[in-house]
A protein has these predicted regions:
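C-terminal segments that line or cap access tunnels to active or ligand-binding sites in enzymes
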Residues: 6-8, 21, 25, 36, ...
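Conserved redox-cofactor binding core of oxidoreductases
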Residues: 9-133
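Short, solvent-exposed loop/turn and secondary-structure capping segments
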Residues: 2-6, 71-73, 139, 189-194
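Short, solvent-exposed loop/turn elements at domain surfaces
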Residues: 1-3, 104, 229
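Short intrinsically disordered, low-complexity coil segments enriched in acidic
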Residues: 1-8, 123-124, 157
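Glycine-rich loop(s) and the adjacent beta-strand/alpha-helix scaffold that form part
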Residues: 13-16, 107, 115, 123, ...
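Low-complexity, polar-biased intrinsically disordered regions enriched in Pro/Ser/Thr/Gly
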Residues: 77-91, 143-153, 273-277
């Protein structure tokens, strides 16, 4: 929504409404975004709930990074099995609506980064280190300067990075520059650790403030009869609605046989409008 650009720490820094659409368009093209074409029972149930709540006109089908057919907005007739990049990308298969998007697509339909951005990065010379965790980042000291000089260890000489690999164990690499992109929590955790260890003592005291995350809650609903059909059919998040107070609700599902996930939740029971447990 446009009003988001007038909120938060980025408000007023740029004409975001004019600048950002082109970048969103690039990301959508690379990720093969398309409107959900696998409408399942959970989506229909959400639409029914929206109608009963008086917000039926807010119901919509989500835009998702999945391949349905060559008629998707950013897809084309396949070349060597690749419907997006003229044969330069990996082979893909259409979505079958199994609901397994969030636990790993088994059919090559989900447009994960290893099928676009990372695929081409590696194809053009980048090295990808899978199952590897960064544990330390230490600026390399400038031997020509005194340890009391602020520029002695300010990163201008590069960094020594300690990695923990599942197969190689611990080892180090050096690099001139670093871009941290481990999402809101992962990047901050690593930076807090480096400041605490004294590796990067000049990290801003504003680290950890004004954080933005998904701010969502997963609420499970169980239907005790079978008249509604399987609720696992479709894509992981296939539709959504908005309530009058701005609350956003989406129909989310996991694949059939994923019942074990219910042990991660607690039971809630409402009586006369009050939460009992």
């Amino acid at each position: 929504q446009d009003k988001i650009w007038q909120q938060g720490s980025w408000a007023g820094l740029h004409d975001w409404q004019a600048v950002m659409p082109q970048h969103y368009e690039t990301a959508k093209r690379m990720l093969g975004v398309s409107q959900n074409k696998k409408v399942g029972n959970a989506d229909l149930m959400l639409q029914k709930m929206a109608n009963l709540s008086g917000v039926g006109d807010s119901f919509y089908l989500t835009d998702v990074g999945a391949y349905f057919s060559e008629h998707d907005k950013y897809a084309h007739p396949s070349v060597h099995g690749d419907p997006y990049f003229g044969g330069a990308g990996p082979k893909r298969s259409p979505c079958i609506g199994c609901g397994g998007c969030m636990v790993g697509c088994r059919y090559g339909a989900k447009n994960t980064l290893d099928k676009n951005y990372l695929y081409f990065a590696q194809k053009n010379g980048a090295t990808l280190l899978a199952e590897t965790k960064v544990t330390d980042i230490v600026p390399i000291a400038d031997a020509s300067k005194s340890p009391s000089d602020p520029a002695y260890q300010n990163g201008s000489q590069g960094y020594r990075v300690t990695l923990q690999s599942a197969d190689k164990g611990e080892y180090q690499i050096t690099t001139q520059q670093i871009v941290l992109s481990a999402s809101s929590l992962g990047s901050q955790k690593l930076l807090f650790e480096q400041r605490h260890k004294g590796n990067m003592p000049h990290i801003s005291p504003y680290l950890g403030k004004r954080i933005y995350t998904n701010a969502e809650s997963l609420l499970c609903v169980r239907f005790l009869d079978e008249q509604h059909g399987a609720m696992s059919d479709g894509v992981a998040i296939g539709s959504g609605i908005y309530l009058g107070d701005g609350t956003h609700i989406e129909a989310t599902r996991y694949p059939e046989g994923f019942n074990i996930a219910s042990f991660l939740a607690t039971l809630s029971n409402y009586k006369n409008g009050k939460k009992m447990s």
